[in-house]
């Protein structure tokens, strides 16, 4: 009840992130309604600076997190009281699901190699935790919430398992295709 919940556009967020955290007032929730990926880090920092005396939890996928990576350093510089909860599946999960449906599993521009999140946290001298099992999730996130200032929690989605394909529309039926 005392935190602000910030979400980037991510497969993990939309499958359960929007449904897990109770939102009591309009200022408890920050979300990019235009479905633009990569705004979460900046929104998390802005919320942390604007919401004095309240913790901010910012949920991002690894794709969106690295799109806003330049802002990550600002969190450290400004001492923003934000926990970055990064759901790491090694690529753009929703794009992979769409490509699986429409391109018979051929992936292009959906997988990437980034620096390790642990290494990024170390460079920023920011506390870091890694969740590799759902049984550890609450304990790891609680430890990050106890930090005064920015902290990073990586959730290894490859070890936890894939999410259902909620976003993918069906293939166009022949009744909709014009000759």
Question: Where are the language model's segments positioned?
Answer:
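Active-site diphosphate/adenylate-binding microenvironment
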Residues: 1-41, 47-48
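Short gly/pro/ser/thr-enriched loop/turn and capping motifs at secondary-structure boundaries
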Residues: 13-14, 36-38, 65-66, 90-94, ...
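Short acidic, glycine/serine/threonine-rich loops at helix termini
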Residues: 15-21, 42, 69-71, 94-99, ...
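Conserved thiamine diphosphate
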Residues: 50-142
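Glycine/aspartate-rich loop-and-adjacent alpha/beta segment that forms the canonical ThDP
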Residues: 134-179
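A short acidic, glycine-rich active-site loop
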Residues: 30-36, 104-112, 179
């Amino acid at each position: 009840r005392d935190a602000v919940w910030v979400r980037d556009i991510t497969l993990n967020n939309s499958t359960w992130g929007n449904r897990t955290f109770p939102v009591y007032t309009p200022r408890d929730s920050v979300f990019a309604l235009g479905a633009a990926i990569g705004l979460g880090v900046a929104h998390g920092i802005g919320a942390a600076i604007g919401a004095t005396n309240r913790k901010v939890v910012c949920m991002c996928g690894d794709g969106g997190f690295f799109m806003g990576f330049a802002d990550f350093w600002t969190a450290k510089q400004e001492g923003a009281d934000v926990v970055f909860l990064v759901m790491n599946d090694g690529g753009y999960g929703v794009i992979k699901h769409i490509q699986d449906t429409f391109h018979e599993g051929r992936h292009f521009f959906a997988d990437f190699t980034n620096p390790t999140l642990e290494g990024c946290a170390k460079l920023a001298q920011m506390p870091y935790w890694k969740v590799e099992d759902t049984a550890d999730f609450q304990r790891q996130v609680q430890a990050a919430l106890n930090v005064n200032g920015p902290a990073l929690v990586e959730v290894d989605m490859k070890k936890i398992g894939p999410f259902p394909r909620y976003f993918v529309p069906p293939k166009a039926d022949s009744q909709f295709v014009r000759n």
